[in-house]
């Protein structure tokens, strides 16, 4: 039991110890990261962050060895500066070599890209400023000491209509100015230095002018080719003779007249006894047509035939005329019992 208690006490004591490798490297005697803000460093005789009688540094030491201090009164900052400098010194700043200038210097100097010289634009004064707004319109103008000028005036009748100008002096010493108008035609600026669009090529300009003349003359060009061979290949196809939508008189077609829709020799078939009948077809008129014998029409033996035979016939039970074989002449006699006879 005593051994257990002794081991526990020893373990607690060792647990409080921080190994050296977790600490920053130990510096020379008289310099280093001391532990306290108010007490002297452990082994450096006045080293550390908080030596008595000084700022962050020890009593005469800091980051940079003897005679320096992080905020000391007479040492150089980081070991680089001479007498009279320091991070928060009285007469120096973060300049490394002492003297005026720095981020947080004391009595003299400030951080500036021009060595402390005041910028002319930052210290510009307003020389003139007028701003008038009434029910009829507005007007304003101003001018500054560094060469900036602007003015504008306008009315709010039938929309805002205004005009004005703007000018300033560039870094090259030249004056740049713009005048403008803003009304129903939009914003139109003018100025010698404004970029201008490139000229239109001559060929494109001629084409635009020709298009304008054609439109004025009522000529409309939709881009369709109308030269040699235009329209070729339109004839034929479904609308040719004998096609599905043949014209009047097309042999064997659906069209009106001739052999086809309107009757005549041939129909949907090839004549003779068959689906289309002999001399007749889908159309009306003629033998086998809409009133002819053996056609699909309303003639004798047709689909809606009022005579004998056919789908609508009263006397015959056959639906189609018998196939006579080969190509018939289309001029036979029709019998309701036996069909066509040639």
UniProtKB/Swiss-Prot annotation:
Domain Chitin-binding type R&R: from-to ranges: 135-198
Give the superkingdom in one word.
Answer: Eukaryota
The cellular component terms of Gene Ontology attached to this UniProt record, alphabetical and capped at eight, are:
chitin-based extracellular matrix
Q: Write the record's keywords in alphabetical order, separated by commas.
A: Cuticle, Signal
Q: What does this protein do?
A: Component of the pupal abdominal endocuticle. May have important role in the larval and adult exoskeleton structure.
Q: Where is the composition biased (Polar residues)?
A: 332-342
State if Signal is listed as a keyword: yes
The source organism is Manduca sexta (Tobacco hawkmoth)
Q: Which GO terms describe its molecular function?
A: structural constituent of chitin-based larval cuticle
**Which protein, by its recorded name, is this?**
Pupal cuticle protein 36
Annotated signal sequence is 1-15
Spell out the PROSITE patterns in the cross-references.
Answer: CHIT_BIND_RR_1, CHIT_BIND_RR_2
Region span, Disordered: 322-342
């Amino acid at each position: 039991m005593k051994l257990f208690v002794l081991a526990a006490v020893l373990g607690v004591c060792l647990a409080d110890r921080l190994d050296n490798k977790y600490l920053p490297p130990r510096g020379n005697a008289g310099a280093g990261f001391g532990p306290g803000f108010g007490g002297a460093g452990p082994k450096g005789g006045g080293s550390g962050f908080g030596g008595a009688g000084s700022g962050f540094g020890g009593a005469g030491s800091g980051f940079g060895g003897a005679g320096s201090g992080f905020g000391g009164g007479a040492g150089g900052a980081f070991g680089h500066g001479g007498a009279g400098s320091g991070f928060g010194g009285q007469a120096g700043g973060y300049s490394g070599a002492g003297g005026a200038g720095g981020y947080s210097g004391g009595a003299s100097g400030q951080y500036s890209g021009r060595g402390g010289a005041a910028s002319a634009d930052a210290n510009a004064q307003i020389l003139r400023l007028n701003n008038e707004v009434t029910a009829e319109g507005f007007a304003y103008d101003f001018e500054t000491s560094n060469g900036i000028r602007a003015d504008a005036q306008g009315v709010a009748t039938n929309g805002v209509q205004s005009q004005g100008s703007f000018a300033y002096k560039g870094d090259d010493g030249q004056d740049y100015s713009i005048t403008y108008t803003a009304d129903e035609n939009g914003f139109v600026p003018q100025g010698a230095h404004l970029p201008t669009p490139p000229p239109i090529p001559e060929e494109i300009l001629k084409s635009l002018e020709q298009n304008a003349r054609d439109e004025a003359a009522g000529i409309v060009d939709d881009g369709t080719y109308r030269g040699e061979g235009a329209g070729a290949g339109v004839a034929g196809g479904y609308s040719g003779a004998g096609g599905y939508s043949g014209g009047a008189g097309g042999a064997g077609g659906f069209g009106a007249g001739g052999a086809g829709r309107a009757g005549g020799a041939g129909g949907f078939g090839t004549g003779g006894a068959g689906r289309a009948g002999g001399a007749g077809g889908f159309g009306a008129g003629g033998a086998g047509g809409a009133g002819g014998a053996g056609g699909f029409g309303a003639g004798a033996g047709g689909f809606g035939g009022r005579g004998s035979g056919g789908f609508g016939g009263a006397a015959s039970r056959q639906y189609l005329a018998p196939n006579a074989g080969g190509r018939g002449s289309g001029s036979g006699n029709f019998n309701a019992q036996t069909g066509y006879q040639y």
